[in-house]
């Protein structure tokens, strides 16, 4: 019987948790981060479930594990883990990971103030602002984002038939905007959104195909983005992003903000150089920007950037003990 030890740096990005695994992560095979992610899921997924689920984590927990880069143009590689699995890319996770990794000396950038991350979704370029030992702000230039489909019809519990757009910003998002059977996220409780979202996601994945044209392993819709009018005077829009099985993102969601900008750009509501300030369900803000136009397999796209902040909350040495009947975690219904 073994006791596995993991040294973690815990923090949050604009309110949403990030658990950075700084020690104890497994060695992974593969020439790309997508291949390493596949190896992790095949052999070491118990680490993810043990660290993310109760009793060591919770429904909203997400995290990351650092690795040497698989490509020469990157400083460090990141594997993103959460309750739903491994993500190709995670915006809030990136901001939190970079903040804590720089502050704790876990990575040394080739150029101070800049960092290139090797992620399963591709290269993510980082610029960060540091004041003494603290990182005050991180801006990530994300992978290309694009509108994938418009006006997909789906039956929502309690609401009835609704239409969604689907956009990619590092993950596939179903974007629910005001319409006949849906008014504004503020008119519904978080518990209602949590109850409806997995049903919507399942029905959309059963009815429609979601396939990234260049990344074969990204082949399902994973997130639901509920929209609403902003409350913060600086914000352009507000959102509540559902992920995993029972989680609403406390941050404005980085890949979700990227997907939303791609949707708006495709409809002529944003253009290169435009700013887009996105508000979360708890009032925190991400500052988005359309950096430039792009293409993904001939499909119009944008390169978005997202800026936000994170704070470290503590150090955590976590044991996963084979003697523990809940070694690999659990999720209460």
Swiss-Prot record:
This enzyme does not require pyridoxal phosphate (PLP) as a cofactor. Inhibited by iodoacetate, iodoacetamide and by high amounts (10 mM) of pyrrole-2-carboxylic acid (PYC). Not inhibited by PYC at 1 mM. It is an enzyme of class 5 (isomerase). NCBIfam families: PRK13971.1. This is 4-hydroxyproline epimerase. Keywords: Isomerase. It holds the Pfam family Pro_racemase. It catalyses: trans-4-hydroxy-L-proline = cis-4-hydroxy-D-proline. Allows intracellular utilization of 4-hydroxyproline, one of the major constituents of host collagen, by converting 4-hydroxy-L-proline to 4-hydroxy-D-proline, which can be further metabolized by intracellular 4-hydroxy-D-proline oxidases. Strong B-cell mitogen. Plays an important role in the regulation of intra- and extracellular amino acid pools, allowing the bacterium to profit from host precursors and enzymatic pathways. Belongs to the proline racemase family. The lineage of its organism: Bacteria, Pseudomonadati, Pseudomonadota, Alphaproteobacteria, Hyphomicrobiales. The active site is at residues 90, 253. Its EC number is 5.1.1.8. GO terms for molecular function: 4-hydroxyproline epimerase activity. It comes from the Bacteria. Homodimer.
């Amino acid at each position: 019987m073994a006791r596995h030890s993991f040294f973690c740096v815990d923090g949050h990005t604009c309110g949403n948790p990030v658990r950075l695994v700084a020690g104890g992560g497994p060695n992974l095979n593969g020439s790309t981060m997508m291949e390493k992610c596949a190896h992790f899921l095949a052999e070491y997924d118990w680490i993810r479930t043990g660290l993310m689920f109760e009793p060591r984590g919770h429904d909203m927990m997400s995290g990351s594990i650092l690795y040497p880069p698989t490509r020469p143009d990157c400083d460090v590689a990141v594997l993103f883990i959460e309750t739903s699995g491994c993500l190709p890319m995670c915006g809030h996770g990136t901001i939190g990971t970079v903040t804590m990794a720089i502050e704790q000396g876990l990575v040394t950038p080739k150029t101070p103030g800049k960092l290139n991350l090797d992620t399963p979704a591709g290269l993510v370029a980082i610029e960060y602002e540091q004041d003494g030992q603290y990182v005050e702000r991180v801006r990530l230039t994300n992978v290309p984002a694009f509108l994938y489909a418009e006006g997909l019809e789906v039956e929502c519990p309690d609401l009835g038939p609704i239409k969604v757009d689907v956009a990619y910003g590092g993950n596939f998002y179903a974007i629910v905007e005001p319409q006949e059977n849906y008014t504004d996220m503020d008119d519904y409780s978080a518990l209602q959104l949590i109850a409806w979202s997995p049903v919507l996601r399942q029905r959309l994945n059963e009815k429609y195909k979601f396939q990234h044209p260049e990344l074969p392993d990204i082949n399902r819709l994973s997130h639901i983005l509920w929209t609403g009018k902003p409350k913060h005077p600086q914000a352009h829009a507000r959102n509540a992003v559902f992920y995993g099985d029972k989680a609403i993102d406390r941050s404005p969601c980085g890949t979700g903000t990227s997907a939303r900008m791609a949707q708006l750009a495709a409809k002529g509501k944003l253009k290169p150089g435009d700013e887009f300030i996105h508000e979360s369900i708890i009032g925190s803000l991400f500052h988005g920007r359309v950096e430039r136009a792009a293409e993904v397999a001939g499909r119009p796209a944008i390169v978005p950037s997202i800026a936000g902040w994170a704070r470290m909350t503590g150090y955590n040495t976590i044991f996963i003990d084979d003697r523990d009947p809940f070694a690999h975690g659990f999720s209460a219904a």
